[in-house]
């Protein structure tokens, strides 16, 4: 979701032998239509804290549609719904102060549903990095109940993805050997 998260994820992928490909101009143009002009215009895609479900879905699906993209890591997800639930518990929070958090929670939950739907639609792994991997975040709960496992660090997500790639290559090699 933000630049620092993306750089960490990209570096972790490369460390684990995964390729983070450049994006074709057509994909960059499509993403540029929904992000502010100052976004990084590259991979990793930095959504510059633009937080609405339609924008994030467009970015995610633009990547998933590309034959050169085998998976997507979404980093920096899940904390809004947690804070939306926790802040109202504070004796210092007024109803007016908590209302924006409820709206953001709804957006984040919609994003979680979009991630789950896109994983099925495109049949590509989508890994999510979040500080909250338990059940303390309603959006992370949505992911977990739909088969999207959260990772606590970009390094863990990249390592898991690397192992998945190794497993797929091993299966392909065995299939080819049989033929």
Can you name each region flagged by the protein language model?
Residues 1-20, 85-179:
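Peripheral docking tails and interdomain loops at the edges
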């Amino acid at each position: 979701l933000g630049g620092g998260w993306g750089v960490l994820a990209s570096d972790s992928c490369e460390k684990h032998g995964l390729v983070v490909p450049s994006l074709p101009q057509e994909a960059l143009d499509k993403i540029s239509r929904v992000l502010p002009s100052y976004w990084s215009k590259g991979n990793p895609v930095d959504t510059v804290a633009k937080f609405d479900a339609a924008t994030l879905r467009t970015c995610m699906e633009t990547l998933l549609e590309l034959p050169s993209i085998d998976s997507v890591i979404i980093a920096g997800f899940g904390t809004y719904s947690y804070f939306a639930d926790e802040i109202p518990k504070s004796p210092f929070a007024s109803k007016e102060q908590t209302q924006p958090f409820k709206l953001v929670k709804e957006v984040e939950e919609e994003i979680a549903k979009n991630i789950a739907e896109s994983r099925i639609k495109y049949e590509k792994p989508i890994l999510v990095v979040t500080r909250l991997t338990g059940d303390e975040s309603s959006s992370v709960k949505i992911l977990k109940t739909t088969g999207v496992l959260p990772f606590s660090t970009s390094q863990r997500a990249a390592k898991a993805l690397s192992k998945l790639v190794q497993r797929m290559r091993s299966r392909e090699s065995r299939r080819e050997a049989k033929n």
